[in-house]
Amino acid sequence: MRVTDFSFELPESLIAHYPQPERSRCRLLSLEGPTGALTHGTFTDLLDKLNPGDLLVFNNTRVIPARLFGRKASGGKIEVLVERMLDDKRILAHIRASKAPKPGTELLLGDDESIHATMTARHGALFEVEFNDPRPVLDILNAIGHMPLPPYIDRPDEDADRELYQTVYSEKPGAVAAPTAGLHFDEPLLAALREKGVEMAFVTLHVGAGTFQPVRVDTIEDHIMHSEYAEVPQEVVDAVLAAKARGNRVIAVGTTSVRSLESAAQAAKSDLIEPFFGDTQIFIYPGYQYKVIDALITNFHLPESTLIMLVSAFAGYQHTMNAYKTAVEQKYRFFSYGDAMFITCNPQAISERP
């Protein structure tokens, strides 16, 4: 399969730069997997689409203020984007500079350059940085970091983004991008879903900056997926198995929840799914046999991205590309701060190719 098979025309005007004033009032395009039928509505229509006993699986990662500005002690300006916190003192990061820093380079970070750090090692495209500060890394980031808005949101981050670019149930700091399907859930909608008898469970996948990296090969089978840390604890496994046993659906909120659940299923030795704690490089594209999820809530993704490939593997290539064409025609808002889709599984998708 070629990467260009997953291309589509997207007017710049449809890229959302700010979220809707009310989280759950975004538009919702529903795609019926088996038939390809499309229905237009709003996000709160989920209340009618979900049944008592269905299981929603959320990603409770919390976005960290991962973008830092400063300079090398020798003078050159730098921009640091944290990829992963290694411990209380060290990070792995992307560094943008006119000249890449060498091990031992001192970095002065923050508006007043009061935070001192040292680049200690290089690991491929990533730099290991150690802070020379008594505070833990997370406190430093909260003090001087900027929210790492995606590259297609062409504006500086604002104070409001610290909450808007966070799910209301975010709990575990570590992501450098939000699990954006979850941004549409507010407390009243969550309460209404609970009241209806919809079950909820939480995985953790710390979304890395690699999620925004373009696919740089022509043939998708040649693509090497970036690595991200995921946790699928025992209580999630129990909830999934219980939902399946009673004939209910497992509904992933976002592609990160999909990748967490399917990673846990791939690694399982005997059961459908078992607890999983570790890095995952799972790459889902047409031909993949889904093991766990029955429905998916997700935003609209970039052309030629691994995420539109994941959706195509679930709903079928033709149904997915037709839905995206319709979304553009109907002026849905795209990407992180945009509108959402509710998709049910297409059992024929596994045998369909572009």
Swiss-Prot record:
Major site of localization recorded for this protein: cytoplasm
Catalysed conversion reaction: 7-aminomethyl-7-carbaguanosine(34) in tRNA + S-adenosyl-L-methionine = epoxyqueuosine(34) in tRNA + adenine + L-methionine + 2 H(+)
GO molecular function: S-adenosylmethionine:tRNA ribosyltransferase-isomerase activity
InterPro entries the UniProt entry points to: QueA, QueA_dom1, QueA_dom2, QueA_sf
Subcellular location: Cytoplasm
Pfam families referenced in this protein's UniProt entry, alphabetically: Queuosine_synth
EC id: 2.4.99.17
Functional pathway: tRNA modification; tRNA-queuosine biosynthesis
Database matches in Gene3D superfamilies: QueA-like
GO biological process, one term: queuosine biosynthetic process
Gene Ontology CC terms: cytoplasm
Record's keyword terms, sorted: Cytoplasm, Queuosine biosynthesis, S-adenosyl-L-methionine, Transferase
Protein family per UniProt: Belongs to the QueA family.
Assembly and interaction partners: Monomer.
Job description of the protein: Transfers and isomerizes the ribose moiety from AdoMet to the 7-aminomethyl group of 7-deazaguanine (preQ1-tRNA) to give epoxyqueuosine (oQ-tRNA).
Protein name: S-adenosylmethionine:tRNA ribosyltransferase-isomerase
Species this protein is from: Salmonella typhi
Gene that specifies this protein: queA
